[in-house]
Design a protein with these regions (language model features):
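Hydrophobic, well-ordered secondary-structure segments
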Residues: 111-112, 116, 129
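Short, highly charged C-terminal tails/helix-capping segments
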Residues: 134-142
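Ribosome large-subunit tunnel/peptidyl-transferase-proximal elements
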Residues: 2-113, 123, 141-156
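C-terminal structural segments of small proteins and small subunits
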Residues: 122-135
């Protein structure tokens, strides 16, 4: 029998850590995009699940900039019928708001809330959420990072 020498490193699972993760910058135009479809793709990119080096316990996701958040679309009657509920902690302190009201006051909040709900509910999820930058206008202050255009249809 012939003995074959194999490089043992090739059989090791590579686990990413803070030092080895390479973060990229992406920009997404939210104009006329359905909110849930945008949020699910962006949440996946923020987590890093689109990378072969994805490690669940490490923030290996990329930075995402979303522009035109005020021009987001919702299907059906969600813009008027959906309710965002919050509570102050006091008796009778429950408040509701429709996406229509929220878009008129703070357009970024609708997109941020949808994406935050799709991230892990932990310290790591909070850390990932800090890599998201949402702007209502079609400009952003991150030109120095040279963000790439993110095609929502290519990443599944």
């Amino acid at each position: 029998t012939k003995l074959i020498k194999v490089n043992t490193l090739s059989y090791k699972t590579v686990s990413a850590n803070k030092e080895t993760v390479e973060k990229e910058w992406f920009v997404v135009d939210a104009k006329d995009v359905v909110l849930g479809r945008l949020a699910s793709v962006v949440a996946m990119v923020l987590r890093g699940k689109h990378k072969p080096s994805f490690t669940p316990h490490v923030d290996c996701g990329d930075n995402v900039i979303i522009i035109n958040a005020d021009k987001i679309k919702m299907t059906g009657k969600k813009m008027t019928d959906k309710q965002y509920i919050r509570h102050s902690g006091y008796p009778g302190g429950q408040r509701t708001q429709t996406p229509e009201d929220l878009l008129s006051k703070k357009p970024e909040a609708v997109v941020e809330r949808a994406i935050k709900g799709m991230l892990p509910k932990s310290r790591l999820g909070s850390e990932m959420f800090r890599n998201l930058f949402v702007y209502a206008a079609d400009t952003h202050p991150h030109e120095a990072q040279q963000p790439k255009e993110l095609d929502l249809n290519k990443i599944k």
